[in-house]
Amino acid sequence: MKYYAIGYATNAALPDVTADDAQKLTHMNLAFGLIKDGLLDMSQLTHIGLTEQFRRWNPALKIVLSVGGWGAGGFSTMALTEEGRRAFAQSCLEAVEQYNLDGIDIDWEYPCSDQAEIDCDPRDKENYTLLFKALREALGENRIVSTAVGAGDYFVRDTEMDKVAQIVDYVQLMTYDMRNGFTHQAGHHASLSASRGDTTNTNTRYIVDLFHNAGVPLEKLVVGAAFYARHYTGAANINNGLLQKASSGIYGPDYGEITEEFRRENGYTEYWDEDAEAAYLWNGSVFISYESPEAIRRKCEFVKEKGMLGVMYWEHSADPTRELLGVIADTLHTK
């Protein structure tokens, strides 16, 4: 089976992409296009011209424009009418043709929710499906239409994933930030399994079963990996801080910073939670949840065991060592 290795890369990350990176990836998601006045806006992607070089390095590389991201609004209003959906889909087609892209990825965070302080509507549930229908009709069967989805029961509740799965090429599970800025308990934000005593359902195995049971075929599921950490302060020095009451999970540090400044330095000790199949750092009061090479490898092996499509990660620039991408490529044999 040919597995996918999909990397999200922001505009700022594109100048640092190397030939070796391009050859290890099967897909690159450009982050992000936005919605402005109901149409696709790509004005912030100033380095998109570099993608032609990426194709020369790897002619098989699929380059997909991802639209949305955390705090990106405009989806609900645009998707409310058939006219709005068609106009947006047409603007996506024009961008795909202009920049020689392979498709469109939708990262709507989240339908039916104003959690990210964006517009929402109860009709988002049905309109989410209709948006993908409009994109498929505009882009045709030979271009990629994909989605990135929140890793929780709320996303399944607020969408029609069984219908969406019939339209899109694949569904990317954002199996990170499962513990986040709204969580006040130190724990793993991207773990494969659950820690002993953790009953929160914030682990990849649970999320895969959740979306599969909601109607997404395993062969269309892509598991997410995090190239960054979340840290919690004020945790009690019990069980190395794991599952202790703490501050909310704050973004950072990136994996590159972990390798340079935190791992076995600055008072931090690295630990492995075998139950959760996840790594973390602890210094007596600060708990840092991150994905180590072994954690990434186990996610990749899990993908292979379950017959899923592959692994994607956020975000390319967060690991300048390229150690984690190397683990993905080696385990999934993408290079």
Describe each model-derived feature in a short phrase.
Residues S317-K335:
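Aromatic-rich peripheral "rim/lid" segments of glycoside hydrolase catalytic domains that contact
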Residues M1-V96, S113, G326:
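Glycan-recognition patch characteristic of GH18 chitinases/ENGases
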Residues K36-T46, Q90, P111-E260:
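Substrate-binding surface in catalytic domains of secreted glycosidases
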